[in-house]
Amino acid sequence: MKSVLVVGLGRFGRHMAAKLIEEGNEVLAVDINEERVNDALDLVTNAQIGDTTNEHFIASLGVGNFDLCVVAIGDNFQSSLETTALLKDYGAPFVLSRANRDVHAKFLLRNGADKIVYPEREMAERLAVKFGTDNIFDYIELTPDYSIY
């Protein structure tokens, strides 16, 4: 069981938090939007309303105690960038950040992200491989260059 912080409870963040819980992990979900936090209360271990671009708020979360921090903010790149940097500044051991474009990924990596995820792109590629070919039922991506079909 891992302890995970999920920042941003839009579609991606909410699904990520729910799946992490389903897999037996503890999840603290954070969003600046009170309605999103209230909607997630039954899905996660704990949920808080807060601005993750605020240093005092990040410090209060004890981010160094989480195994994984997921920055799932998709609609505000500046907030995503600041949150990623603050998480690393306050001791987060591993930060997975969402990017919508390659230029976003470049800045997120420079500011502390350990891994970048492109949810829409990655799912589109996976579905194109699965449904665009008659003989492939599923595949596992081992690295960006190698997959098992």
Regions from the PLM with identified roles:
Residues 1-149:
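Cytosolic regulatory regions of ion transport systems
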